[in-house]
Curated annotation (Swiss-Prot):
Its EC number is 2.4.1.-. It comes from Kluyveromyces lactis (strain ATCC 8585 / CBS 2359 / DSM 70799 / NBRC 1267 / NRRL Y-1140 / WM37). This is GPI mannosyltransferase 4. InterPro entries: GPI_mannosylTrfase. Belongs to the glycosyltransferase 22 family. PIGZ subfamily. One of its GO terms (biological process) is GPI anchor biosynthetic process. It is an enzyme of class 2 (transferase).
Length: 505
C-alpha cells in the first residue's frame, strides 16, 4: 500500500518536474527542437554539425514524425510561445513513456508482485522525471526500445499459442528496428541479444517471419532514406542520405569522438550505471536476474556501448526500465534492509530530481523566453550551456561562436557590425576573449548585454576598471556545476545574470 502511494506521488512529481525550466545537455535542443522548429516556423537558429548537408548524421524524417504534430496543433490551436511549446513536448514525452512502460511490463512474463515493485522503482526514479521528459533523442530511443521488446514478447506469445508469428507483428518488429536505428545509431546495440532470442523462439522453424521482418525493415528504411534525401537535397545534398551510416562512420574515428570527450571504457558500467540506479544497484547485484528479453537487451546495450570511448549517462537511460523488469523482486519485502533501501532510494531520487530537474542550468530558458519574438541587442553568452536559439523565435537572428586554430580559441568569425538580434556563444572561453568581444562590439554599438552564471562573478574583476556592468535581469534558479572550483566552496553560487555592459569613459 505504501509503495502504491509513493508510486502515485512519483507520477505527480514527474509531471511537476516536466514543467520546470532545467537544461540538462545542449543535445536536448540542438538534436531535436532546434532544427525542426526553425524549419517549421522560418525562425533563424543554430545549425549543428549533425545536420550539415555535407555529411548529414541525423534523420530529419524521424524528427518530423515525432515533433511536427504538436507544432501543427500549436500553430492552429494553442498558439503558445516557445516556452509553452517546450513544456508541452516534455509532457508529451513523460506521459507517452509512462503509458508505454505499462504495456511493456504487462508482457514481461513476471508476477503481479514484481510488476508492482518494478512500476514503483521506474515511476519514482529521477531518470523518469528528468531524462524521459526532456527532448533527448535518447528519451525517444527508450520509448521505441520498450515498444520493440513488447512486440518481441508478443511474437513469442503468438508462436506459443498458434505456432507462428503473424505478419502484422513481424512487420511492426521490422518497422521499429528501422525507426529506432534512424532515431539513434546506438539503438541496434540494445537489440542484438533480444533478436537472437526471438529468432530462436519464433523464426528458427518459421523462416517466413524472418522474411516479413527483413522486408519491413528494408521498406521503412528506404522510405526514411528517401524523405531524408529529399529534405537535405533542398540544402545542396547531392547523394542518398543514410543518416545512421554517416553517424556511425563519424563515431568510428577517435579524432572525431575526442572533440566531444573521451572516457574510459568502464564509464558506463562503473559510473553511469550506479548514477542511474542509485541505492537499488544493491538489488541488482544481490538478486537473481530473470534472464528474459529486458535483461538480454540491457546486457547487450551496455556491453556494445562500452566499446566506444564517448560515454555519457544519457546513452544508457533505457537500462532503468529494463533492469527493473529483469530483477526478481517477488521476495523484495524479505530482503535484508528493504525499508532502508526504499528510504535511501526515495531520498536519492528527490535530491537528484531537484538538482537535475529543477535547478540545473535552469536560468537559461526563462531568460531567452523573456526575449522570445522580440527585438534585442547583442547577447553575449559566457560560461553557460549553449543557448537554445530556437526559443528566441526570431526570423532575423544572427548566431556566432568561437573558432579554433591548432587548438587555440579565437573570435575571428564573428560579424562585429551586426548589433541587433545577435547571439554570441563564447562557451567557456577565457577572460581575454570576453574582453576582446566586448571591445569589438563597443566600436559599433553601446547596447551590449552579457549573460553569465554567478559561479564566475569573481572572474569579472579584472574588467571592472574598464567596463561598467549593470544587472538588468537575474534569477537564483540556476545551478552551474561546470565552473565549481572545489574545494573552494565560495564558487558554489546559484544564479544567472544579464548585464548591460558599457565602457567607462
Amino acid at each position: 500500500m505504501k509503495l502504491k502511494l509513493y508510486e502515485y506521488l512519483g507520477l505527480i512529481i514527474g509531471l511537476l518536474i516536466a514543467l520546470e525550466p532545467s537544461y540538462i545537455h545542449p543535445d536536448e535542443h540542438f538534436q531535436t527542437l532546434e532544427p525542426i522548429f526553425t524549419a517549421w516556423t522560418g525562425a533563424k537558429g543554430t545549425a549543428t554539425w549533425e545536420f550539415l548537408p555535407e555529411n548529414p548524421c541525423r534523420s530529419i524524417t524521424i524528427l518530423r514524425l515525432y515533433y511536427t504534430p504538436l507544432l501543427w496543433l500549436n500553430q492552429h490551436i494553442f498558439h503558445l510561445k516557445p516556452l509553452g511549446l517546450l513544456y508541452l513536448y516534455r509532457l508529451q514525452n513523460y506521459l507517452l513513456y509512462t503509458a508505454v512502460v505499462i504495456f511493456f511490463l504487462e508482457f514481461c512474463e513476471v508476477s503481479i508482485t514484481h510488476k508492482t515493485k518494478a512500476k514503483f522503482f521506474i515511476r519514482t526514479s529521477y531518470v523518469t522525471w528528468v531524462f524521459q521528459s526532456h527532448t533527448f533523442s535518447n528519451s525517444l530511443e527508450t520509448i521505441i526500445l520498450l515498444l520493440f521488446l513488447f512486440t518481441c514478447q508478443y511474437c513469442i506469445y503468438e508462436v506459443r499459442s498458434r505456432h507462428y508469428a503473424t505478419f502484422s507483428s513481424c512487420f511492426l518488429l521490422g518497422a521499429l528496428i528501422s525507426i529506432g536505428t534512424f532515431n539513434r545509431v546506438t539503438f541496434p546495440a540494445y537489440l542484438i541479444l533480444p533478436l537472437l532470442s526471438v529468432f530462436y523462439h519464433c523464426f528458427l522453424s518459421h523462416w517466413i517471419g524472418v522474411a516479413y521482418t527483413a522486408i519491413s525493415t528494408a521498406l521503412v528504411s528506404a522510405l526514411i532514406i528517401l524523405f531524408d534525401t529529399k529534405a537535405y537535397s533542398s540544402t545542396d545534398c547531392k547523394s542518398w542520405v543514410i543518416a545512421p551510416l554517416n553517424n556511425l562512420l563519424y563515431n568510428m574515428k577517435v579524432d572525431n569522438i575526442a572533440q566531444h570527450g573521451l572516457h574510459p571504457r568502464y564509464t558506463h558500467l562503473l559510473i553511469n550505471l550506479p548514477l542511474i540506479c542509485g541505492p537499488i544497484i544493491l538489488l541488482f547485484i544481490s538478486q537473481k536476474a530473470v534472464l528474459k528479453l529486458p535483461a538480454l537487451s540491457c546486457i547487450s546495450g551496455i556491453l556494445m556501448l562500452s566499446l566506444f570511448r564517448h560515454q555519457e549517462l544519457r546513452f544508457i537511460i533505457p537500462v532503468l526500465p529494463l533492469l527493473c523488469a529483469s530483477m526478481n523482486l517477488d521476495n523484495f519485502d524479505t530482503f535484508f534492509q528493504a525499508e532502508t533501501i526504499i528510504t535511501s532510494w526515495l531520498v536519492f531520487n528527490i535530491v537528484m530530481g531537484l538538482i537535475m530537474g529543477v535547478f540545473h542550468q535552469a536560468g537559461i530558458i526563462p531568460l531567452i523566453s523573456y526575449f522570445s519574438g522580440e527585438e534585442f541587442p547583442v547577447h553575449i553568452w559566457w560560461k553557460t550551456y549553449s543557448p537554445p536559439t530556437w526559443m528566441y523565435s526570431n526570423p532575423d537572428l544572427t548566431v556566432s561562436t568561437t573558432n579554433f586554430k591548432e587548438n587555440v580559441e579565437f573570435v575571428d568569425n564573428i560579424p562585429w557590425h551586426v548589433v541587433s538580434n545577435h547571439v554570441v556563444d563564447l562557451k567557456g572561453s577565457d577572460i581575454e576573449l570576453l574582453n576582446k568581444t566586448l571591445t569589438k562590439f563597443s566600436e559599433n554599438t553601446d547596447s551590449i548585454q552579457l549573460i553569465m552564471p554567478n559561479t564566475v562573478l569573481d572572474k569579472l574583476t579584472p574588467l571592472q576598471s574598464q567596463w561598467k556592468f549593470i544587472t538588468e535581469w537575474e534569477t537564483q534558479q540556476h545551478l552551474d556545476l561546470d565552473h565549481i572550483d572545489m574545494p573552494d566552496w565560495t564558487t558554489i553560487k546559484p544564479g544567472l545574470r544579464l548585464y548591460n555592459v558599457s565602457l567607462i569613459v
